């Protein structure tokens, strides 16, 4: 197994999290860190760790050839020794030492791609509550669609592919103008979506460092939304209808609340919240979501809808400069 981490100016995160990846209980694996023209001490951190871990490999890209992560990812894949690739990020750490084992146990000849889950670390702030809820919402959507053999995206913080999938991907072979979303476009370019499976074992989850200020979070989400406009039309339609239906629910409720149908509106609203709370509770239990999200999810959903509207508009016109 080849674990690949693309890093750009990630010295602090690598010093915190990389050893969680290196200390996995797996018979034979390598960890490849591709230093994408960093200007901090990323390479020095890796070289120091190499003294203790023979499985750790460093590839340094001296000059920035592209604003996207694609060149770094390509370089890592082509340099890998094994037939399967497990992706994660510098700011991530597996929750257990069995991460590689559990993810790889889902692989088969007919299922060469495994989508994992990567929740964010919890901290008591409203931004973090938004991040926690949005991550849960996104995971329910992309994991459930993958189970239906209709996958449309993956999370590069925790995803496994056969090396052949990378080499055969049009996104891997050809340059595009996108600066992010290489993981998503790999799924979009797969002809047989039945070859994708998921891992819901909690010990296969990978914790990720969340943004702690609104500006950084907004910039990160804009990159994600920019990629979504390049999904297949059917996937864009599905996501569009999902968000529009949620927005219509809240707008309709507010309009009817100040009409002569306010009693009916309140009844339907309460029943809907109850049913959704049950399902969100089930999803949260499976995906180990933070408990505060369960208590205030209606507030978070309403706020997130407004934020997603702005992100959707911004993602349509935003010109990205770099993957970081």
Residue ranges and their predicted role:
Residues 62-80, 102:
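Glycine-rich, basic loop-to-helix element that forms the pyrophosphate-binding segment
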Residues 10-23:
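Short, well-formed alpha-helical segments that are part of the catalytic scaffolds
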Residues 1-2, 30:
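Cell-envelope/extracellular polymer assembly enzymes that use nucleotide-activated donors
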Residues 85:
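Short aromatic/hydrophobic "clamp" motif used to bind/position activated sugar donors
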Residues 107, 113-138, 164-167, 171-236:
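Catalytic donor/gating beta->alpha subdomain of glycosyltransferases that bind UDP-sugars
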Residues 20, 27, 35-45, 63-65, ...:
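A conserved acidic beta->alpha catalytic loop
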Residues 243-320:
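Membrane-embedded multi-pass helical conduit in multi-pass membrane proteins
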Residues 41, 90-105:
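Acidic donor-binding/catalytic loop of UDP-sugar-dependent glycosyltransferases
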């Amino acid at each position: 197994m080849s674990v690949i981490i693309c890093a750009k100016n990630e010295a602090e995160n690598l010093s915190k999290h990389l050893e969680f990846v290196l200390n996995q209980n797996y018979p034979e694996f390598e960890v490849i860190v591709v230093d994408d023209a960093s200007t901090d001490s990323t390479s020095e951190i890796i070289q120091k760790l190499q003294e203790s871990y023979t499985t750790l490999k460093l590839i340094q890209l001296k000059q920035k050839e592209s604003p996207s992560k694609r060149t770094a990812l390509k370089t890592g894949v082509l340099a890998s020794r094994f037939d399967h690739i497990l992706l994660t990020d510098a700011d991530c750490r597996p929750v257990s030492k069995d991460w590689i084992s559990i993810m790889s146990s889902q692989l088969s000849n007919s299922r060469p791609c495994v989508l994992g889950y990567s929740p964010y670390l919890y901290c008591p702030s409203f931004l973090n509550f938004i991040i926690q809820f949005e991550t849960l919402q996104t995971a329910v959507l992309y994991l459930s669609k993958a189970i239906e053999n209709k996958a449309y995206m993956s999370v590069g913080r925790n995803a496994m592919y056969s090396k052949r999938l990378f080499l055969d991907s049009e996104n891997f072979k050809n340059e595009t103008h996108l600066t992010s979303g290489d993981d998503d476009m790999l799924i979009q370019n797969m002809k047989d979506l039945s070859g994708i499976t998921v891992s819901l074992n909690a010990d296969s989850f990978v914790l990720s460092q969340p943004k702690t200020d609104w500006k950084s979070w907004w910039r990160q989400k804009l990159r994600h939304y920019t990629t979504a406009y390049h999904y297949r039309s059917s996937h864009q339609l599905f996501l569009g209808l999902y968000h529009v239906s949620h927005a219509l629910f809240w707008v309709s409720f507010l309009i009817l609340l100040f009409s002569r149908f306010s009693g009916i509106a309140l009844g339907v609203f309460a029943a809907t919240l109850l049913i959704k709370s049950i399902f969100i509770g089930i999803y949260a239990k499976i995906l180990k979501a933070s408990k505060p999200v369960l208590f205030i999810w209606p507030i978070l959903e309403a706020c997130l809808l407004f934020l997603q509207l702005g992100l959707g508009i911004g993602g349509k016109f935003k010109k990205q400069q770099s993957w970081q």
